[in-house]
Curated annotation (Swiss-Prot):
Lineage: Bacteria, Pseudomonadati, Pseudomonadota, Betaproteobacteria, Burkholderiales
Binding site for [4Fe-4S] cluster 1: C11, C48, C82
EC number(s) given by UniProt: 2.8.4.3
Function (record text): Catalyzes the methylthiolation of N6-(dimethylallyl)adenosine (i(6)A), leading to the formation of 2-methylthio-N6-(dimethylallyl)adenosine (ms(2)i(6)A) at position 37 in tRNAs that read codons beginning with uridine.
Protein name: tRNA-2-methylthio-N(6)-dimethylallyladenosine synthase
Domain called Radical SAM core: residue spans: 142-375
Protein family: Belongs to the methylthiotransferase family. MiaB subfamily.
Residue stretches making up the MTTase N-terminal domain: 2-119
Alphabetic keyword roster: 4Fe-4S, Cytoplasm, Iron, Iron-sulfur, Metal-binding, S-adenosyl-L-methionine, Transferase, tRNA processing
Principal cellular location given in the protein's record: cytoplasm
């Protein structure tokens, strides 16, 4: 049986795309996934260009595969994702043993690219942007668990000054409304209970409705997804504050399946820096959206992104970021030191802040966020949380683990329940009382009223 090894870098969109690569190759050639590159007939790197030195990391990985390729001449080596879009044919020029190079929008063409490579003996490169075509050529999703990702759109048209995504994934293109609903319904029929809707900027979704000229916005899509039988939770990522509309905020009042957790990247707490980043909103506008949302959902947890050390960032600018963190009380963040991306406007900005200062700022920011996380977790002790049971606990396979609405892992034991019954709980919703908070997880006990029903 032929096998494919896929190494994924970056965001959840890439995780989704990697799953689709696997699905495409399974449908076309019967390839099955493997975690061991030495056992693979096809090795793919799904790359991310958001962070610094992304290209170097790719070529470092390719260097390690070169020796394997020498031992297995028929091994197919491919590079996909955003670095592939950015570098294109130059990847093959630098590493001639790479067989296929493809972008996020052309992953559905993988079988054809591999076949062309075998037929012609020449490396194949396709990093074009055929809009939403790829979704029309993907096989039905294969379910692994009670949670699944569903991509609703591709690309981004915001052109923040530091971001390479519009250049690597293209402009915003929304999937047709009916196509998204059909995919979610198909997943629900296979036992999926929680869907995460994906896009570089899901708020910008504007999907074509059937054969009409009407378009559905993101709030309407959420409303219809919630009506699909079997779907009990809805998450989404990533959203842009500029388009966090009043209709979307109102959806939290009318749609109980929307979880009490939101990832809303702010990037900075200084209006001056936000303007330089070309984010399109002020700190006050951002805080206003959070205030309106919390008026509807007081317990909603907010996650975010921060860029530290953007060119021109002063101590006063950074202090404003810290003020915002204290005011909002963020529950986790993805925070990084700014790194210039080639071809973006911000790469030309003068940057005179010492690296040591940037590192100290990042350390301070992350420590503060960790304090928030610990405080919020501790505040959950004694509460009853509804969790989606995901599977056996990683540390103790005789226990189970699940996830709360605010995205925390809860481990719990059911010592009086036979293993067969424990396994039957995977994919189900359970009420669990939180009894202890750890730095990165919670400990729970199944609520007594649910324990009785679980035992039968």
């Amino acid at each position: 049986m032929k096998k494919v090894f896929i190494k994924t870098y970056g965001c959840q969109m890439n995780e989704y795309d990697s799953d689709k690569m696997s699905d495409v190759l399974n449908a076309a050639e019967g390839l099955v996934p493997t975690d061991t590159p030495e056992d693979a007939d096809v090795i793919l790197f799904n790359t991310c260009s958001v962070r610094e030195k992304a290209q170097e990391k790719v070529f470092s990985e390719l260097g390690r595969v070169k020796a394997l390729k020498a031992l297995k001449p028929d091994l197919v080596v491919g590079v996909g994702g955003c670095v592939a879009s950015q570098e294109g044919a130059s990847i093959v020029a630098r590493a001639p043993y790479v067989d296929v190079v493809f972008g996020p929008q052309t992953l559905h063409r993988l079988p054809d690219l591999i076949a062309a490579r075998r037929r012609t003996g020449r490396s194949q490169v396709d990093v074009s942007f055929p809009e939403i075509e790829k979704f029309d050529h993907l096989p039905p999703a294969r379910v692994d668990g009670a949670s699944a990702y569903v991509s609703i759109m591709e690309g981004c048209s915001k052109y923040c000054s530091y971001c390479v995504v519009p250049y690597t994934r293209g402009e915003e293109v929304s999937r047709p409304f009916d196509d998204v609903l059909a995919e979610v319904a198909g997943l629900a029929e296979q036992g999926v209970r929680e869907v995460t809707l994906l896009g570089q900027n899901v708020n910008a979704y504007i999907g074509k409705m059937g054969d009409t000229s009407e378009r559905a916005d993101f709030a309407l899509l959420l409303e219809y997804v919630a009506e699909i039988p079997g779907i009990e939770r809805i998450r989404y990522t990533t959203s842009h504050p500029k388009e966090f509309s009043s209709r979307l905020i109102e959806a939290y009042a009318t749609n109980p399946k929307l979880v009490d957790h939101l990832h809303l990247p702010v990037q900075h707490g200084s209006d001056r820096i936000l303007m330089a980043m070309k984010r399109g909103y002020t700190v006050l506008e951002y805080k206003s959206s959070i205030r309106k949302l919390r008026a509807i959902r007081p317990n909603i947890s907010i996650a975010t992104d921060f860029i530290v050390g953007f060119p021109g960032e002063t101590d006063a600018d950074f202090a404003k970021t810290m003020d915002l963190i204290h005011e909002i009380g963020y529950d986790t963040s993805f925070s990084f030191i700014y790194s210039p991306r080639p071809g973006t406007p911000a790469a030309n900005l003068h940057d005179d802040t010492p690296q040591a200062v940037k590192l100290e700022r990042l350390k301070h920011l992350q420590a503060t966020i960790e304090e928030n996380v610990a405080r919020i977790s501790q505040g959950m002790v004694g509460s009853v949380q509804r969790i989606l049971v995901e599977g056996p606990s990683r540390k103790d396979p005789t226990e189970l683990h699940g996830r709360t609405e605010n995205n925390r892992v809860v481990n719990f034991a059911l010592p009086d329940l036979p293993q067969v019954r424990r396994e039957q709980l995977i994919g189900q919703m359970l009420d669990v009382r939180i009894v202890h908070a750890f730095p990165h997880s919670l400990r729970g006990e199944v609520a007594e009223e649910r324990m009785a029903s679980a035992a039968h």
